[in-house]
């Protein structure tokens, strides 16, 4: 892919002629400063997605595979490109490695944009048709999609080694110029250069841009529809649960505590009595908040935030690779163009494209808090505190999940409360009573409880603070 050299490395000539060599060494130093962050940053991305459960979703699995491609660029492509620059673009390695190196170069750059295209398509389907997409959400199916992306990339790049190695041991007419520079010669690979640029970049880029704008449009529409349904504002903390009412004929039953005096849930309140007044009957009727609606709004907010981050990744990738592919097609179609100028532009734009492999981890660090925290822990080797916290959270979550699976919607509150006592759930807070129990004295009470979620909603005008004590 490199069709021009920078300048000869001369060390045994007079001082005035050493300037090109000095400039070349500075360029090599800058290139090394690009290679090292590319390798380190993408290793951090792979570790974060592999180890952090919060980051293990379909989009991030694609990003991890993208990081693998970028990591391989830093390990296999950039160092050899640096060597060719140090040797004045003369290929210093065994000649059969030239088509293999060109194959890896095309493969990884193609895989990068194919991953971004697959991410945009997968996210659009997930937002547009969540029910259908949920059927293909398992890790195995995501890995199958990733394998398909790599397979497509391999199929696009495979003509290079096939055509190059087939002409060995006389590959000079295939991948080497008269200066023994390892390149895709336009007279031999003209059709491949045009076809590869269209299939590997311009067509996926067009699809990706269309899908991205459609995704943003769908998200905005869903947010608008969801917000239009929310016409109630709450001025005090709320704990939202899902209750089943008895039939109208059944009289209200008082809540019976179990033998230990523990209730189903407990809450510790710290109330500022100044300026607080008891809510009226109309205000109490607004104290039921839809947990599902709140969760949907949070989900859409997260999707919008993720779309912005991916939009930045898309934009940077396009800005950094578009000049190379435009120049690449120009070199194949423009016969009268100066080969030296085209070659130098190809060399510069190739390295601009390589830089994009090291920028993605920086984008994740700046715009994603979970990635940023994970990177900080990995760099500082701080695993012990994080592991103990995660184990404690996992133990508490699993304990509560086991109890919730035994709660029956047909059992009474007191019977369900005994499950917490049997599991030795202890806390030292005051008993909690549902806000729905204070609605009206004649209202029906609930005998069956389905603990969907306990949701605390805080507003600016509220001075009352509540804390749910689970363990």
Swiss-Prot record:
Motif DRY motif: residue span? Answer: 122-124
Q: Name one GO biological process term.
A: vasoconstriction
Q: Where is this site: Hydrophobic barrier that decreases the speed of ligand binding and dissociation?
A: 184
Q: Which GO terms describe its molecular function?
A: Gq/11-coupled serotonin receptor activity; neurotransmitter receptor activity
Q: Which Cys-Cys disulphide bridges does the record give?
A: 98-182, 334-337
Kindly report every residue range on the membrane side named Extracellular: 1-26, 84-99, 163-191, 330-344
User: Which key words tag this protein in UniProt?
Assistant: Behavior, Cell membrane, Disulfide bond, G-protein coupled receptor, Glycoprotein, Lipoprotein, Membrane, Palmitate, Receptor, Synapse, Synaptosome, Transducer, Transmembrane, Transmembrane helix
User: What tissues express this gene product?
Assistant: Detected in brain, heart and gut.
Q: What is any Pfam family matched here?
A: 7tm_1
InterPro entries in the cross-refs? 5HT2B_rcpt, 5HT_rcpt, GPCR_Rhodpsn, GPCR_Rhodpsn_7TM
Top-level taxon: Eukaryota
- One CC-aspect GO term: plasma membrane
Q: Which family does it belong to?
A: Belongs to the G-protein coupled receptor 1 family.
What this chain does, per the entry, is described as:
G-protein coupled receptor for 5-hydroxytryptamine (serotonin). Also functions as a receptor for various ergot alkaloid derivatives and psychoactive substances. Ligand binding causes a conformation change that triggers signaling via guanine nucleotide-binding proteins (G proteins) and modulates the activity of downstream effectors.
The entry's protein name is 5-hydroxytryptamine receptor 2B
């Amino acid at each position: 892919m490199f069709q021009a050299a920078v300048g000869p490395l001369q060390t045994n000539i007079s001082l005035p002629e050493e300037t090109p060599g000095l400039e070349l060494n500075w360029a090599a130093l800058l290139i090394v400063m690009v290679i090292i962050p590319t390798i380190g940053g993408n290793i951090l991305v792979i570790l974060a997605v592999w180890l952090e459960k919060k980051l293990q979703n379909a989009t991030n699995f694609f990003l991890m595979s993208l990081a693998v491609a970028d990591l391989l660029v830093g390990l296999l492509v950039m160092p050899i490109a640096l060597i060719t620059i140090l040797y004045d673009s003369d290929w210093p390695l065994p000649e059969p490695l030239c088509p293999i190196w060109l194959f890896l170069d095309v493969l990884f750059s193609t895989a990068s944009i194919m991953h971004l295209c697959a991410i945009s398509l997968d996210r659009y389907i997930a937002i547009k048709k969540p029910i259908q997409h949920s059927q293909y959400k398992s890790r195995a199916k995501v890995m199958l999609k990733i394998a398909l992306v790599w397979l497509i990339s391999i199929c696009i790049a495979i003509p290079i080694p096939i055509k190059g190695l087939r002409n060995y041991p006389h590959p000079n007419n295939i991948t080497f110029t008269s200066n023994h520079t390892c390149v895709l010669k336009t007279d031999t690979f003209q059709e491949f250069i045009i076809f590869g640029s269209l299939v590997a970049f311009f067509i996926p880029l067009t699809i990706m841009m269309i899908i991205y704008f459609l995704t943003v449009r769908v998200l905005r529409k869903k947010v608008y529809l969801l917000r239009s349904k929310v016409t109630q504002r709450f001025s005090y903390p709320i704990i939202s649960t899902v209750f089943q009412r008895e039939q109208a004929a059944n009289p209200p039953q008082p809540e019976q505590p179990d033998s230990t005096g523990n209730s189903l849930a407990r809450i510790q309140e710290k109330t500022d009595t100044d300026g607080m007044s008891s809510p009226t009957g109309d205000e109490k009727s607004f104290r039921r908040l839809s947990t599902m609606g709140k969760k949907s709004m949070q989900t859409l907010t997260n999707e919008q935030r993720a779309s912005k981050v991916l939009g930045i990744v898309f934009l940077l990738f396009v800005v950094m690779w578009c000049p190379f592919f435009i120049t690449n097609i120009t070199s194949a179609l423009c016969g009268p163009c100066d080969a030296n100028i085209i070659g130098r532009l190809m060399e510069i734009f190739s390295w601009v494209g390589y830089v994009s492999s090291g920028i993605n981890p920086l984008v994740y660090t700046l715009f994603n808090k979970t990635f940023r925290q994970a990177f900080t822990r990995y760099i500082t080797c701080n695993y012990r505190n994080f592991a103990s916290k995660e184990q404690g959270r996992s133990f508490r979550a699993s304990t509560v999940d086991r109890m919730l699976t035994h709660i029956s919607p047909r059992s009474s509150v007191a019977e369900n409360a005994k499950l917490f006592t049997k599991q030795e759930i202890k806390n030292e807070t005051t008993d909690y009573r549902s806000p729905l129990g204070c609605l009206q004295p004649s209202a029906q009470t609930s005998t069956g409880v389905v603990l969907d979620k306990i949701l605390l909603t805080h507003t600016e005008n509220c001075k009352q603070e509540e804390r749910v004590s689970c363990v």
